[in-house]
Amino acid sequence: MIKINLQLFAHKKGVGSSRNGRDSAAKRLGVKRADGQFVLAGNILVRQRGTKIHPGVNVGIGKDDTLFALKDGKVKFARLGRDKKQVMIVTAE
């Protein structure tokens, strides 16, 4: 007579370990100054990844694609064609 010794092992790891449970902090991206709002030179207008909104007159662009005011004035958002947006600063001069 043949005896078979069959052992079954766990397919999944047991309790006490979690493979989830991590998340990155939000990056606070988006428009920081509204259309028509007065800004000072150096104020951040838009934080973005890539150029969803392009810089216009009196607007600079940082190495992380952040748009900021180069001069004091009012913020003006405009559309360029169907799919392009631009932000500019209109000065009082």
From Swiss-Prot:
Q: Which residues form the propeptide?
A: 1-9
PTM info? The N-terminus is cleaved by ribosomal processing cysteine protease Prp.
- Record keywords: DNA-binding included? no
Q: One Pfam annotation, family name? A: Ribosomal_L27
Q: Which UniProt keywords apply?
A: Ribonucleoprotein, Ribosomal protein
**GO biological-process terms attached to the record:** translation
A GO cellular component term found in this entry reads: cytosolic large ribosomal subunit
Q: What family is it from?
A: Belongs to the bacterial ribosomal protein bL27 family.
Q: What is this protein called?
A: Large ribosomal subunit protein bL27
Q: Which organism is it from?
A: Ruminiclostridium cellulolyticum (strain ATCC 35319 / DSM 5812 / JCM 6584 / H10)
Give the taxonomic lineage as stored in the record: Bacteria, Bacillati, Bacillota, Clostridia, Eubacteriales
